[in-house]
């Protein structure tokens, strides 16, 4: 409601709105009907690999001691996943309500909307819950959905980064991206124009860099906190 009020008050004026929703996040809880929308007994649990942890980097072993997924019962884990799905559906409905508000105000064809998340969740994968310093796909592969004037509806497979968001916004505002910014504007690729392929992207969590190689089949990350740099596989 406050986001729509903000837009309504600035009708006819350029505006920038950062609409932040804290969910899905711990504690895993939401309201009805979302809390019972996904029956826990219908949900599959991620596979558990016996003795998986002993070959992982030291940083991941430390995180596991704090956020142990294997210490959570299957029933509890299903409850967590059920609520996580419910929270995401709640967000989906709220974002839909906001987009409908833009349409009512006549702004849907003149507004750039960017939907993004900062990280994913383990939800039991790799015997972990919540998040950690490891660069697994379930944590770093986040949604980046953009609706913009003249954008071509498509699914983009090329490697992009959250640092591309700011240059993209500047491009649509008709502003130059500072030379010190590493990100690239996604405006060309949204218009189905040429976009140079990336060889790499940077990522960091809690001050711990993770070199990450991804050939689209076997992502491998290495932790600088591991004495033997043991690889962590997807």
Language-model-detected regions and their locations in the chain:
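Active-site-proximal cap/lid insertion segments
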Residues: 1, 6-13, 18-159, 172-175, ...
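Generic preference for hydrophobic/aromatic residues in regular secondary structure cores
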Residues: 43-45, 50, 160, 201-207, ...
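C-terminal cap/loop subdomain of S1 sulfatases and analogous C-terminal strand-loop tails that border
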Residues: 119-125, 166, 171-234
């Amino acid at each position: 409601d406050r986001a729509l009020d903000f837009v309504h008050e600035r009708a006819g004026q350029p505006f920038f709105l950062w609409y932040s929703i804290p969910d899905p996040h711990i504690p895993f809880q939401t309201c009805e009907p979302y809390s019972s929308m996904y029956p826990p007994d219908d949900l599959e649990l991620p596979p558990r690999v016996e003795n998986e942890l002993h070959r992982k980097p030291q940083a991941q072993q430390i995180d596991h001691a704090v956020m142990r997924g294997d210490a959570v019962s299957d029933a509890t884990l299903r409850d967590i996943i059920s609520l996580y799905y419910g929270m995401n559906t709640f967000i989906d409905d709220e974002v839909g309500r906001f987009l409908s508000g833009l349409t009512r105000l006549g702004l849907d064809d003149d507004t750039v909307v960017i939907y993004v998340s900062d990280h994913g969740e383990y939800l039991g994968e790799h015997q972990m819950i919540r998040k950690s310093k490891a660069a697994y796909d379930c944590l770093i592969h986040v949604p980046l959905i953009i609706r913009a004037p003249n954008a071509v509806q498509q699914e983009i497979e090329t490697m992009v980064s959250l640092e591309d968001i700011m240059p993209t916004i500047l491009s649509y505002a008709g502003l130059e991206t500072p030379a010190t910014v590493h990100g690239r504007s996604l405006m060309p690729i949204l218009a189905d124009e040429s976009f140079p392929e990336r060889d790499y992207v940077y990522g960091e969590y809690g001050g711990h860099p993770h070199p990450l190689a991804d050939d689209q089949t076997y992502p491998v990350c290495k932790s600088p906190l591991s004495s033997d740099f043991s690889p962590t596989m997807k």
